[in-house]
């Protein structure tokens, strides 16, 4: 099968109302997700973190949990979480300690460097989020965030990050 080439008469993507996919919610959400993700990833890259690594650090900064509990809270599957914690451990941001109640279980803990990096990452992530959302009128922004929250903690509350098989 040959390479697909877009038609030369395709409209620019910035013609929102007239774009052929302007009523496709999945496509729209994907574009927003990609835009947020690209900006956040670029900001976190300066701190030598991925978005997923920041999510794990952020959860660890808030709760004392086993690795299994951490995965459930962050909605990251076991394989992806193991890879993420391995990376954070190599960077000196996390250590794994045996759970005193179950020696088979591990409790990831932030190192002092991990705590500092998490705080910095949270600041830059919030700045990126605010820069993006500040482009919306306040009432629209509140409705947008409220609607996302309803979906995230409602019908998509069990959605999980899955390890990429590459």
Regions found by a protein language model. Name each.
Residues 1-47, 166:
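N-terminal leader segment of winged-helix/HTH proteins
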Residues 24-28, 55, 105, 131:
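Amphipathic alpha-helical recognition patches that constitute DNA-binding helices
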Residues 34-80, 160-166:
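N-terminal helix-turn-helix DNA-binding core of bacterial DNA-binding proteins
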Residues 37, 86-149, 153:
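Charged, amphipathic alpha-helical coiled-coil/dimerization segments
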Residues 68, 78, 83-93:
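Carboxylate-rich helix-loop segments that flank metal/cofactor sites and access channels
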Residues 142, 153-166:
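Short amphipathic alpha-helical interaction elements located at domain edges
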